[in-house]
Amino acid sequence: MSKKQFYLVREDMLTDAMQRTLEAKALLSAGKVRKINEAVHRVGLSRSAFYKYKDGIFPFHAIAKERIMTFSINLADRSGTLSQLLNIVADTGANILTINQTIPLQGRANITLSVDTAPIEIDINELFERMEALESVERVELVGSGS
């Protein structure tokens, strides 16, 4: 599994496509446009570039205020797997808010886990690493965040 890292980067260091993606996201969140197609057209960005970067680039103020993170986790269907995963999250000091698990199909289950990270005692990168280090974890993705 690839290790996910998070960085704080000055705006002038971002590629043009990344900067335009941020502009398009700002238009959408402010309600100045209703559709992605309108936003990318207004900022002069292709839809494919927008979709490439939209889930991976955020303004710093948006991340700094985020407390609740939602993860999508693919697990192998083995006894005790979910319990091990929840223990890893709880051991960081994070507060588990919601857990949704699909019925295991073909030996795999998907878990959606919402976590309050305000009380967390480690770096978010470390949390990702610990979850991904579980032998039964096949994939961990951050699918959303909010306050």
UniProtKB/Swiss-Prot annotation:
Residues 70-145 form the ACT domain. SUPFAM superfamilies: ACT-like. Gene3D superfamilies: 3.30.70.260. It comes from the Bacteria. HAMAP family: UPF0735 (MF_00707). Belongs to the UPF0735 family. NCBIfam families: PRK04435.1. This is UPF0735 ACT domain-containing protein ABC1543. It comes from Shouchella clausii (strain KSM-K16).
